[in-house]
């Protein structure tokens, strides 16, 4: 399945719009505590552990988006937006959400 942040796919013609599709993934409080506890793996101001967890959450959200688009009969998702949001100041959960428009292209 083609995934893109752009509103069109160059060289392809959109023949059907299925509508908005989304996917979400939430990192729980324990994961974030573990990540922040592992801050000592900082290299050049970046935490490899934290980045890996964020990447994994983004991959889960994108897989869910693809599954939802596939169920509709789409073969591409255009205009994808990826957002990161902290849920609750006390429990520190992090949500990765992705959304886009499911389409069929030829």
Swiss-Prot record:
Pfam families: YbjQ_1. Disulfide bonds: none annotated. It comes from the Bacteria. Signal peptide: none annotated. Belongs to the UPF0145 family. This is UPF0145 protein NE1032.
